[in-house]
UniProtKB/Swiss-Prot annotation:
Binding site for (R)-pantoate: 57, 150
Membership in a protein family: Belongs to the pantothenate synthetase family.
Species annotation: Burkholderia thailandensis (strain ATCC 700388 / DSM 13276 / CCUG 48851 / CIP 106301 / E264)
Subcellular location: Cytoplasm
Protein name in the entry: Pantothenate synthetase
Enzyme Commission (EC) number: 6.3.2.1
Gene Ontology cellular-component terms listed: cytosol
Length: 279
């Protein structure tokens, strides 16, 4: 595996490749990330991964400085997955001058849910993903359903900007107790880690309520928020949306069997966790 930080060197290395499968990450790789590499291999060859902690998608009071950076361990994991190139640029490589041009998602997708609680987050994501796509020029890129809203936004962005990249969605990987794998799980104390699976269990109860025929979605959401709050969580939202566009469904759409998803974000202690479950 070649480890490259220069954009020009990356382009030189990938020249002539027309079936590249790309997996962008921020590093601190776990089994969830590695499953993305394996899925990428099913859709293209060679597989290119990137590791870049993107300052643009962190707010002023978020964890950019303490976000775990484990490059050497990540390199060893990617080598075992037979990744062809790891693109690991420095901030100077990616942003040699101030990034004045930004890619901003539409308000209906970018300013709801995560976008409401993390202003500017998806503009940072779309900007860096677009720039990475321009550097790698993949045929396929793999994104996890764990970041469901991000997946929807990137997919729509590629469609509307006519980027010649197929976006492949990967299922969320979970620990045996149901907790979705996340680099931020390492922030949890022992007691918090024991409590953390309750987030996925809460989503399962929401799903079951909808599948059992309950139609007052707002009441289901309020019940879930109250349940988490009573257990010491600080929920930002529990929200049932249409999978297609993350719009809140109407009663008629629910009855018609529109595919739904329930999404949540909540703090446990100082750690903010997100999760979702398709219904």
């Amino acid at each position: 595996m070649k480890v490259i930080s220069s954009i020009q060197e990356l382009r030189d290395q990938l020249r002539g490749q027309n079936r590249t499968a790309f997996v962008p990450t921020m590093g601190n790789l776990h089994e969830g990330h590695l499953s993305l590499m394996r899925l990428a291999r099913q859709h293209g060859d060679p597989v290119v991964a990137s590791i870049f902690v993107n300052r643009l998608q962190f707010g002023p009071n978020e964890d950019f400085d303490k976000y775990p950076r484990t490059l050497q361990e990540d390199i060893e994991k990617l080598q075992k997955e037979n990744v062809y190139v790891l693109f690991a640029p420095t901030e100077r490589d990616m942003y040699p001058e101030p990034q004045e041009y930004r890619v901003q998602p539409p308000h209906d997708l970018g300013d709801i849910l995560e976008g409401e609680f993390r202003p500017g987050f998806f503009t940072g994501v779309c900007t860096v993903v677009t720039k990475l796509m321009a550097c790698v020029q993949p045929r396929v890129a793999v994104f996890g359903k764990k970041d469901y809203q991000q997946l929807m936004i990137v997919r729509r962005m590629c469609q509307q900007l006519a980027l010649p990249v197929e976006i492949v969605a990967a299922e969320t990987v979970r620990d045996a107790d149901g907790l979705a794998l996340s680099s931020r799980n390492r922030y949890l104390s022992e007691a918090e880690r024991a409590e953390a699976p309750e987030l996925a269990k809460t989503l399962a109860r929401v799903r079951d309520a909808v599948l059992d025929g309950e139609r007052d979605l707002a009441a289901i959401e309020r019940r879930a928020v109250a349940h988490l709050s009573a257990r010491g969580w600080q929920p930002d939202y529990v929200s049932i949306r249409r999978r297609e566009n993350l719009v809140a469904p109407s009663a008629a759409q629910i009855e018609a069997g529109d595919p739904l998803v329930v999404l949540t974000a909540a703090k446990l202690g100082a750690t903010r966790l997100i999760d979702n479950l398709e219904i």
